């Protein structure tokens, strides 16, 4: 069996086992249609997440907001509520502001468990209180500085129809109720990504239009003896969350794979992403792609398994994917065999995704129509994305199903139906995935193709009244989601019938064949794929 061997200086610096996510970002001049786009794969084992909704509201003076930890649901305290809060559906609000995240951990001693706000609270409160990305940064940092931040180090994606930003934040230690943070605007013609490793290094403190930071971002490091250089040379990542082997191989390699899709120059950063060379040149925060990216490009990037790269999961001799070579691996990522430490690769697409999205933000359309959260409730590779417009004020039933949760199955719930199908396909991937992909791609293509027509109709209604457009887009978003659920249920039935008991029943155009006497046609018994059989026989010798 092909083995990956641990780098000798692997260190446990961050809680990567619990919160491993990926964000991809596209500036408006780097997209094919002028959209700002960003993505989120929320990856956490055991995670069950509905499409959340916070309705727009006005709050009387003196109203307090209860704060519950997003990961644990533990009560953290309360803060004064804002007089006005905006409609939020998933991770986009009615002004098209979108916020996502990945956890990088950083120095353990900087965590302040006494803070009131966790990273999830900052996201959803920020969405409820902001109309632009810059305003969201101000809201989130002001709240963290006033009430304390209790999570590990975090990278936030913060976008609106005109700008894309990333912000990194860490606490200042137990009881401090203080944070260090820096936010950098991604150039309009660039793409960026982050994946559980701090990415902001040096930043131009004089560039007030494109850089924001806390007053203590450098002085705090000096006070701890972690930095003694000039302000201009200060490196946020190296000081507060220097990448170890895992930070490079399991995290930065995902960024590399995204960049590698759109730039031929990424070969020189392979040594950095591999994690073995301590002096390898780090990747830039962003790159200018060699071509502009479409919505479909981002959906495809979210399904990445390092195909055709040095990190591919289908290398010759690697039987870790099982008989039918799934591009997934059991976790934890690291494991031990006869005293030798080994590890698996960690691609963008991963089985523990609770939900995924591609957010599309467009400045030239009315805000109710311009923002679309292309949403799915499982690993991006195994599901289609359905459109949820930012004005939606009632989540589709399949994305918010009463009674369904992490331990309660519901046939009406997208998470459970999508996971049901995925978990049939994973162990027999090369056999069953083509059938899944055909349905997935047909739905993706149909929704993207119909988008102009749907938005033309919404625009006609908007000319009459915004409420009519909102009602139409609520109905359209729900229709697409329920159509997807129906197709996925049919797919589940097809798969269990066709591939029952490790056989393959013949079919034609989706209809199973019968014998001349009305019985099921003779099944095929495919046996081992040739590559797997060859490796298995090698192990016997």
List each language-model region with its residue ranges.
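Glycine-rich, aromatic-lined ligand/substrate-binding cores of catalytic
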Residues: 221-372, 376
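Histidine-centered catalytic/metal-binding microenvironments
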Residues: 440-541
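A contiguous strand-loop segment
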Residues: 19-119, 139-295
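Sec-dependent N-terminal signal peptides
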Residues: 4-14
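Substrate-recognition/cap regions that form aromatic- and gly/pro-loop-enriched pockets
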Residues: 323-459
């Amino acid at each position: 069996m092909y083995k990956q061997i641990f780098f000798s200086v692997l260190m446990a610096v961050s809680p990567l086992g619990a919160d491993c996510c990926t964000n991809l970002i596209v500036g408006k001049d780097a997209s094919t249609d002028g959209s700002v786009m960003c993505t989120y794969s929320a990856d956490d084992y055991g995670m069950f997440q509905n499409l959340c909704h916070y309705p727009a509201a006005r709050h009387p003076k003196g109203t307090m907001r209860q704060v519950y930890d997003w990961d644990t649901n533990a009560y953290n305290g309360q803060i004064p509520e804002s007089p006005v809060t905006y409609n939020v559906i998933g991770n986009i609000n009615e002004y098209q502001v979108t916020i996502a995240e990945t956890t990088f951990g950083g120095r353990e001693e900087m965590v302040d468990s006494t803070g009131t706000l966790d990273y999830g609270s900052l996201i959803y409160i920020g969405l409820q209180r902001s109309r632009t990305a810059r305003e969201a940064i101000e809201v989130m940092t002001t709240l963290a500085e006033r009430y304390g931040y209790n999570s590990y180090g975090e990278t936030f994606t913060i976008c609106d129809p005109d700008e894309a930003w990333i912000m990194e934040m860490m606490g200042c230690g137990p009881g401090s109720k203080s944070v260090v943070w820096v936010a950098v605007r991604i150039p309009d013609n660039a793409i960026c990504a982050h994946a559980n490793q701090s990415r902001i290094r040096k930043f131009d403190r004089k560039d007030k239009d494109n850089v924001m930071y806390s007053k203590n971002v450098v002085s705090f490091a000096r006070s701890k003896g972690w930095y003694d250089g000039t302000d201009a040379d200060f490196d946020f990542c190296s000081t507060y969350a220097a990448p170890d082997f895992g930070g490079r191989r399991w995290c930065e390699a995902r960024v590399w794979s995204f960049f590698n899709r759109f730039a031929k120059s990424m070969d020189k950063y392979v040594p950095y992403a591999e994690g073995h060379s301590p002096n390898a040149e780090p990747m830039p925060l962003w790159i200018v792609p060699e071509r502009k990216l479409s919505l479909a490009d981002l959906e495809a990037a979210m399904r990445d398994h390092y195909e055709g790269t040095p990190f591919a999961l289908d290398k010759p001799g690697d039987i870790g994917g099982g008989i039918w070579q799934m591009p997934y691996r059991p976790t934890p990522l690291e494991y031990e065999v006869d005293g030798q430490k080994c590890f698996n690769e960690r691609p963008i697409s991963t089985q523990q995704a609770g939900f995924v999205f591609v957010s599309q933000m467009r400045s030239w359309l009315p805000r109710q129509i311009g923002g679309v959260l292309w949403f799915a409730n499982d690993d991006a590779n195994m599901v289609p994305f359905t459109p949820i417009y930012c004005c939606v004020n009632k989540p589709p039933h399949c994305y918010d199903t009463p009674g369904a949760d992490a331990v309660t199955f519901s046939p009406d719930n997208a998470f459970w139906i999508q996971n049901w199908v995925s978990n049939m396909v994973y162990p027999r991937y090369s056999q069953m995935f083509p059938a899944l992909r055909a349905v997935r791609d047909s739905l993706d293509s149909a929704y993207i193709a119909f988008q102009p027509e749907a938005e033309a109709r919404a625009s006609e209604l908007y000319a009459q009244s915004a409420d009519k457009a909102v009602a139409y887009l609520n109905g359209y978003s729900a229709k697409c989601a329920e159509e997807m659920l129906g197709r996925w249920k049919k797919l589940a039935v097809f798969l269990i019938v066709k591939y029952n008991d490790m056989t393959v029943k013949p079919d034609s155009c989706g209809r199973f064949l019968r014998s001349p006497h009305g019985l099921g046609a003779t099944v095929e018994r495919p046996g081992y794929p040739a590559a797997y059989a060859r490796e298995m026989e090698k192990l016997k010798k």
